[in-house]
Amino acid sequence: MNVIFIEVYLLALFFVITKAQLRKEAYMSVPSLIKAAGYPVEKHRVSTEDGYILQMHRIPAGRRSARRSGEPNRKGKRAILIVHGLFGSSGDFVIMGPERSLAYLLADAGYDVWLGNLRGTVYSTHKKLKRNDAQFWDYSFHEHGNDDIPAMMDKVLEITGPPWEPPVFSQPCRSSPSITTK
């Protein structure tokens, strides 16, 4: 009987400790996760023509890179924009940690990584509408592909200039294939 009690106690203790460790990262923002992983991070805001304000997260260098956030000389680094799919956010590309997450792997490979957030995520707002307004949520994939992604692409090009890679991981890319010609 005492053995069962001790096993249950140890199991409960394990779950309490594990839950405490998970809780810390579960409530961190994407920029906080990136910074905690040892990468430089920048937040940028971009406005769409229909008034949405989208937050983008930039990882301008890998952990072992000499270049850090805010340095003007990109030294030929290629910028790459990664955009999440339905019900996602930029967190999708950093949540698995530095050894397995796409954003970190690309940054360590020498890319200037930009993580885009489409309208409807926690990282989007609107100039006039509030989240509880029905009009805030009145959009479709059409607006993702025709408004959000081109605005993000323009922001990347404004900050970094060429060379750059068009979006490579995005469900809305099919909405407007012509955007890859920017």
Task: Please give the residue ranges for each predicted region.
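Eukaryote-biased feature marking scaffold/signaling PDZ-domain proteins and nuclear chromatin regulators
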Residues: 6, 41, 51, 75-78, ...
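Cleavable N-terminal signal peptides of Sec/SRP-targeted secreted and luminal proteins
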Residues: 2-20
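Short, hydrophobic/aromatic-rich segments at coil-to-beta transitions
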Residues: 38-44
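Short Pro/Gly-enriched beta-strand edge/turn motifs at strand-loop
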Residues: 24-30, 38, 133
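Alpha/beta-hydrolase active-site loop
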Residues: 134-160
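Hydrophobic transmembrane alpha-helices of multi-pass solute transporters/permeases
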Residues: 2, 47-51
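Short, surface-exposed "cap/lid" segments of acyl-processing enzymes
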Residues: 28-29, 33, 48, 55-131
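Glycine-rich nucleophile elbow surrounding the catalytic serine of serine-hydrolase chemistry
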Residues: 84, 147, 165-180
